[in-house]
Swiss-Prot record:
Its cofactor is Mg(2+); Mn(2+). Keywords: Hydrolase, Magnesium, Manganese, Metal-binding, Protein phosphatase. This is Protein phosphatase PTC7 homolog fig. Coiled coil: none annotated. Signal peptide: none annotated.
Amino acid sequence: MLSSLAGKLQGKTKFLIDVLKFYDARMLKSSSMSGIGKRGDPYLVKVVQGRSRKHSIASAKDNHRYGEDSWFISSTPKAEVMGVADGVGGWSELGIDSGLFASELMFWCANYAKRESFDGRTPLDLLIESYSEIKGKTDPIVGSSTACLVSLNRRDCTMHSANLGDSGFLVIRNGRMLHRSEEQVHDFNAPYQLTVVPNERFDNVYCDRPELADSTRLPLQEGDLVLLATDGLFDNVPESLIVKTLGKYQGVTREEDLQSAANSLVHMAKDLSISPNFESPFALKAKAFEVDYPGGGKPDDITVILATVAVPQND
């Protein structure tokens, strides 16, 4: 069974990567700036950084993947949308790359986000429709993934979110934490996750519904920082250190400066993940769940999307 599954996935891998490369070539051209929009509507200046646990920091940015993590950004005249997904690594024991499932989930979210009717107010709908798209295929990609979507309605500058699992986002205003998403877990290191299983019966996997995602609404203002990331960041870098690092970039709108901030967070997460004596957020979670963990960080794939709210200047 496993060899059959692996053979099918190899063909799907090539097809999916080819499709993603085509859509990446168009999307990366507008990665930091918004769609045309109405004059004066706020927009997001956005940057992305990450690294695979097994490879270098620039391992797969062009494919919108860092290891089993995947991401997307989308800009239209009505909405700015960002998303991250973390493929659940346990499937690797069956020869299945959950990064493919995460990639396809983000691909469809990006696709639906570009519809003219989408105005950023219902990111949960993107998640529901994308998951349904994957499950509805005759021979779907198999795997599991967390997902976090954040969208900005450009007309009223209100942020809407849908977060399922232990990826997440936070908002910083005036150097202080304004909001942080709620983590959703079944147990220690067992996040809520969207899942597609093979035709064979699988009883030992979590299969959560996208409707379980935590949804929030938050008015934003010029200069607010929005950080979206997988647990490779949040499991290794304490919230206080994230806020301190990003506080230096409050009000910054130059893409180069934001990229420097994102780079710093990713390097910090990587260094702390391999520190054996550091009391990481992951180690503290283990203690809270009364799980025997020797301490230190948690080596993992890391994906960070950092954005700031900007308003076009009058001529």
